[in-house]
A protein has these predicted regions:
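Sigma70-family region 2
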Residues: 13-17, 40-47, 58-75, 96-98
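Amphipathic alpha-helical segment used for protein-protein interaction
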Residues: 34, 84, 115, 119-161, ...
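Amphipathic, Lys/Arg- and hydrophobic-enriched alpha-helical face
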Residues: 27-49, 65-69, 149, 194, ...
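Structural recognition of an alpha-helix C-terminal capping motif at a helix-to-coil junction
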Residues: 54-61, 76-88
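Conserved RNAP core-binding helix
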Residues: 5-11, 28, 47-69, 166, ...
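Arg/Lys-rich amphipathic alpha helix in sigma70-family domain 2
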Residues: 69, 84-124, 138, 201
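DNA-recognition helix of helix-turn-helix
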Residues: 91, 145, 156, 165, ...
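N-terminal module of bacterial RNA polymerase sigma factors
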Residues: 1-29, 36, 68, 126-128, ...
């Protein structure tokens, strides 16, 4: 079950005090979130050249080594800090395949892209049902959504990611999934119905 915002604040403090295992538990709780962002941060031409899990592992390793530089105190600040690290990892990966783009500009562009992807996760929550209460929202909803999506079947997760996070219309989603537009829309409806209780149990 996804930790609450208050649990995360305590875990951040334990990690700062170098309690054994605390930093690993803390960073691992963002793994699904970062994996989803890594996928949306790679365009179609690069998705076959990189495993998002490898990019996330690289980002989490860097975060572990640099945790002393983190100055935030809550879940949202840590999620933002990790997005910045992931953006740099993505920029480094892209640099190996593409040249002529200034690195600093690429990192800023990717950082904005990941921020937009994180915001798009909120729209998935809105589509799946009523918004959570303000007390529940203390936990970063992008992290909650990512953990819930990880529990769905591959097809259910894929249709939500393609439509909401990659912004594809139903015809494009259908082509990617080898189904008709009508079929993927029905699949999406069932996926959202299954997603909502998975979100609720994490809030």
């Amino acid at each position: 079950m996804t930790a609450s915002g208050s649990d995360l604040i305590r875990l951040i403090e334990r990690a700062r005090h170098e309690e054994p295992g605390a930093l690993d538990r803390l960073l691992d709780s963002y793994r699904n979130y970062l994996r989803l962002l890594a996928r949306t941060g790679l365009d179609a031409s690069l998705q076959g050249k990189a495993d998002p899990s490898d990019l996330v592992q690289d980002a989490l390793l860097k975060a572990s080594l640099r945790f002393g530089q983190f100055r935030g105190s809550n879940d949202a600040e840590l999620a933002g800090w990790l997005r910045q690290i992931l953006a740099r990892c993505l920029a480094d990966f892209i640099r190996r395949y593409r040249t002529g783009i200034r690195r600093a500009g690429r990192e800023q562009s990717l950082d904005r892209l990941l921020d937009r992807s994180s915001e798009a996760m909120g729209r998935v929550l809105a589509a799946s049902g009523p918004s959570p209460s303000s007390s529940a929202a203390r936990r970063d909803l992008g992290v909650v959504l990512s953990d819930a999506l990880a529990q769905l079947s591959d097809d259910y997760r894929e249709v939500i990611v393609l439509h909401h996070l990659e912004g594809l219309d139903w015809d494009e989603v259908g082509k990617r999934m080898g189904r008709s537009a009508g079929a993927v829309r029905m699949l999406w409806t069932r996926a959202l119905k299954q997603l909502r209780p998975l979100i609720d149990e994490r809030l």
